[in-house]
Amino acid sequence: MSGTSWLQFAALIAVLLLTAPALGGYLAKIYGDEAKKPGDRVFGPIERVIYQVCRVDPGSEQRWSTYALSVLAFSVMSFLLLYGIARFQGVLPFNPTDKPAVTDHVAFNAAVSFMTNTNWQSYSGEATMSHFTQMTGLAVQNFVSASAGMCVLAALIRGLARKRASTLGNFWVDLARTVLRIMFPLSFVVAILLVSQGVIQNLHGFIVANTLEGAPQLIPGGPVASQVAIKQLGTNGGGFFNVNSAHPFENYTPIGNFVENWAILIIPFALCFAFGKMVHDRRQGWAVLAIMGIIWIGMSVAAMSFEAKGNPRLDALGVTQQTTVDQSGGNLEGKEVRFGVGASGLWAASTTGTSNGSVNSMHDSYTPLGGMVPLAHMMLGEVSPGGTGVGLNGLLVMAILAVFIAGLMVGRTPEYLGKKIQATEMKLVTLYILAMPIALLSFAAASVLISSALASRNNPGPHGLSEILYAYTSGANNNGSAFAGLTASTWSYDTTIGVAMLIGRFFLIIPVLAIAGSLARKGTTPVTAATFPTHKPLFVGLVIGVVLIVGGLTFFPALALGPIVEQLSTQ
């Protein structure tokens, strides 16, 4: 792999470290308990109109159960709206190519997918969805589903920071502030940058062009830049086009690719700094940042290195896969030459470490070990750095589990940020940890046993199993990326992956809010010499170990039957 690839990696880390603290401080002010918020003069009047129309009292706060019901109610409304738009898109405006209504099972899957911030797509975007559906349905959900995840995180942090409190904030107020004060401004800036790098933004249908051979070719158009900006910033990932950010109209230049990769990561990393500021101990923010960063960097290096080695079967045929003056080297199957294996592998680690799921290369064409990296990264629970809000939720749950284990080892009641971790919290942590693996492995096992589901594979043997595993891993972790060799646009896959997405969203959000409510009611214990410090390298290593052991022990048998066996068969 060329030195340029490593330079891009180092530059991305540097830019993230420069920008994340500033954004994190801004986020902490938005979600903090202070009355004055940044942007009150601009956004305050708009928010007041929204509160009046929706009959929301911005001065009232909610208990965790009411907060959870608000999240559920909003999600149900979002699902019904998006499902209705997709089913009736044939009679709705901004449909220049007269696309018909989306079929029932595809509409169900798409509505669940975008409502849960998964953005799994069993359809081809430019061939299935009209501009109206893309703009008013999918793009709107990109904003609000990501914002809902950030609201849940804000509630959890308040639960850790407050003492003997019964409320966690107001979901509707948090949602309005997140969309208006965070997502809109960031998306506007990123969209302008993407347009400057050749990403299209128009309301055209298909344009007919004549190729050099004289045959006509249909060139799609659409409001792409505005949707790509929020799909990356909100770690949504659903592409306007079927090949997602591998399409030049979504991701044209290496600079644009860099901007999009930064956009995927910036909010999850910035939330670490917001966390440290909101709990009044910046060292805690640096600790969770270190945990996220170490895992993400490790996965990125692994993906880039495995793909740089190339396909071992081509080595046996004497094919040169080394970096030369006229090729970037490595396994270039399924990759864009303008990015090469370095930027592709880095993106793969970033998109699966978050809940993003967008791709600039085809993960199904990776080498067995290269493809195992994004698969395993999702199986860790997407905590490095995780999606907008939900990633840090998961990491804080793992931190609670880590301090519980540490407490058992020394015979002391475990504490996190001065709050005692007791049976109530651990039952909820257990539910959180078990929900995703149960959904993933149950549906994957059922699909292996059903002949019609097996028929959707384009590859037999261990790689076919990897395709099925990847689909349910992506759905249950609300990621959305895919091994595209699996034909998932069938009734069975649309339905079961849809259910997996619902479990992966709400069976995690509700326990997190319950944990937040339980912790908020507690007081804090004073720090003593026996208190386990949660801001030092020992704690960082312990949490990383818990994340790797929980993910590794749960999914290693499945990985052994899929990518590991496939790798051994290529030797």
From Swiss-Prot:
The answer to whether UniProt assigns keyword Cytoplasm to this entry is: no
Annotated InterPro entries: KdpA
Segments spanning the bilayer are 7-27, 66-86, 137-157, 188-208, 255-275, 286-306, 390-410, 430-450, 497-517, 538-558
| Keywords associated with the record | Cell membrane, Ion transport, Membrane, Potassium, Potassium transport, Transmembrane, Transmembrane helix, Transport
Superkingdom in the source lineage: Bacteria
Would the keyword Cell membrane turn up in this protein's UniProt record? yes
GO CC aspect terms: peptidoglycan-based cell wall; plasma membrane
Tell me the Pfam families matching this sequence.
KdpA
Gene Ontology MF: a single term: P-type potassium transmembrane transporter activity
Q: Could you tell me the Gene Ontology terms of the biological process aspect for this record?
A: potassium ion transmembrane transport
What gene is it encoded by?
A: kdpA
Briefly state the protein's biological role. Part of the high-affinity ATP-driven potassium transport (or Kdp) system, which catalyzes the hydrolysis of ATP coupled with the electrogenic transport of potassium into the cytoplasm. This subunit binds the extracellular potassium ions and delivers the ions to the membrane domain of KdpB through an intramembrane tunnel.
Q: Subunit arrangement?
A: The system is composed of three essential subunits: KdpA, KdpB and KdpC.
- Similarity section: Belongs to the KdpA family.
> How is this protein named in the record?
Potassium-transporting ATPase potassium-binding subunit
Q: How does it sit in the membrane?
A: Multi-pass membrane protein
Biological source species: Mycobacterium tuberculosis (strain ATCC 25618 / H37Rv)
Where is it localised? Cell membrane
